[in-house]
Each structure stands twice: as C-alpha cells, then as structure tokens.
C-alpha cells in the first residue's frame, strides 16, 4: 500500500512514482467516496497491477458517531464503493473499519455483501487494538463459518498494537483461516 492519494499531493505523487518504478502490485487507500476512488485510480494509472483499498466503518460506534449513519447505509455505501472501484479495472480490497468491535452478524452480512459486489480481498481490522487474540481468532472463524461466499475472496487481517497484541492477534487470525 503506497499511500492515500487524496490525502495530500505528496501521497498522490508517491503512489504515481511507486507505480511507475515497481513491477509488483501497488495499492492505494481510499475512503468509500467517489472522489477518493477517482483520485486513487488516477494515481495507479502506471501500476502493472493496481489495487484500490476502500472501506467504511463496521462497528455500531463508528457507524453512529464517526459516520452519523446506519447499518443499512453502510451496507449500501460499502457495496457501492467496491463496485465503483472494480469498474475502474483494478483489484479491490475492502476494509471493514473497526471490525474488532463490530456486531458479528452485521460484520458477516457486510463481508458477504462486499464479496458479492466484487471485492477480491476483505480486510478485517482491529482498528482500535481492542481485541484479545482468542477473541480475534473467533471473530475470523465466525466469518469463515457464516459468510456463504467467503471462498470468493482473500480474508486478510490488520491488527493495531494499542494493547501490545497486534502480533498475537494477527497469528490468531491466520490460524483461523485469514491469509
């Protein structure tokens, strides 16, 4: 992941130049907004294999307080963003921000919907570093047990180290089936 192109001219230029210089995949981070995805696609123009990494909050606390939204609107926005990014011709990775605190039934519903929309990779972040390893592993296992189309995408983890558990949580996620 080479940068967040819409965040600054420097990040945009970094993604452009890295895309020109390397022969491997290059990823650009976005929010689930049209302008973010458009700018990321432009920055990835020279990439041999580009990926747009887009997403939205999945926990009720993020949905209500960060996005002033509802679960239904998050489902709609997330699937729209995946389809829009996919139509740019790049691989798409979706992040379910704050998945560590998300309701598991809703998280599974969101993951299934974005895979149906075309996500190649679904990232399950412990955004706040809130999870303990055994619980994070169970969270990933729940997705593998309840998302019908989970075999159509790569499930990845992204654990923060607020409690010093990022490595342990990552290993727990991998042991539960994430890659």
Question: For each of these PLM feature ranges, what is it?
Answer:
Residues 3-9:
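Short secondary-structure junction/hinge motifs that connect adjacent elements
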């Amino acid at each position: 992941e080479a940068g967040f192109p819409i965040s600054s001219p420097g990040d945009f230029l970094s993604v452009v130049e890295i895309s020109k210089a390397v022969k491997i995949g290059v990823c650009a981070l976005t929010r689930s907004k049209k302008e973010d995805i458009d700018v990321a696609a432009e920055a990835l123009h020279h990439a041999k294999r580009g990926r747009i990494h887009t997403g939205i909050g999945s926990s009720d606390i993020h949905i209500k307080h960060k996005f002033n939204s509802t679960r239904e609107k998050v489902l709609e926005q997330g699937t729209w963003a995946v389809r829009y990014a996919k139509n740019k011709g790049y691989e798409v990775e979706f992040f379910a921000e704050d998945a560590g605190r998300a309701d598991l039934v809703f998280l599974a519903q969101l993951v299934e919907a974005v895979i149906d929309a075309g996500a190649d990779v679904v990232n399950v972040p412990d955004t706040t570093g809130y999870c303990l390893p055994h619980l994070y592993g169970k969270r990933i296992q729940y997705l593998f047990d309840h998302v019908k189309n989970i075999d159509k995408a790569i499930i990845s983890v992204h654990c923060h180290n607020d409690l010093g558990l990022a490595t342990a949580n990552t290993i727990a996620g991998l042991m539960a089936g994430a890659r």
